[in-house]
């Protein structure tokens, strides 16, 4: 869902309100998948929704600088790969495919003298943000540790 809305936003600009509503709905669906919507402390879920939607938009804003989206994504994916070997919180193929995808993107985005061949756009940066947030959420749930 979020990929489709972001794709449309890349083709023709959507109002911020439409994008934010779609992002919140997608995050609620992710929280449902993570099975954290039943928490008795509803305010924690609301705060987590705001933080996660904000984090996904921060990654989207970084896409305009060559290599920064890929660099930050890899700096999260490599530790997640190592932690997954120990805790097994997601299927390892999800991390491997995500890492390889970001590495290929990095090849075209990180170029000398600011001449990037491509950018992720909204569809790429928001999608990778949601994938990273999903994996981090699974890790937090598996280890019950937020630090």
Predicted regions and their residues:
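"…together with the soluble PPM/PP2C metallo-phosphatase catalytic core" -> "…together
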Residues: 1-147
């Amino acid at each position: 869902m979020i990929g489709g809305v972001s794709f449309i936003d890349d083709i023709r600009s959507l109002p911020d309100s439409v994008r934010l509503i779609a992002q919140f709905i997608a995050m609620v669906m992710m929280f449902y998948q993570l099975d954290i919507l039943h928490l008795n402390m509803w305010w924690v879920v609301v705060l987590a929704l705001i933080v996660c939607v904000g984090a996904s938009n921060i990654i989207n804003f970084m896409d305009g600088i060559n290599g920064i989206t890929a660099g930050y994504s890899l700096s999260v994916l490599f530790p997640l790969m190592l932690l997954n070997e120990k805790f097994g919180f997601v299927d390892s193929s999800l991390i491997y495919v995500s890492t390889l995808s970001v590495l290929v993107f990095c090849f075209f985005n990180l170029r000398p003298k600011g001449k990037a061949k491509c950018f992720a756009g909204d569809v790429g940066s928001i999608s990778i943000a949601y994938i990273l947030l999903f994996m981090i959420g699974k890790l937090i749930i598996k280890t019950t540790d937020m630090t």
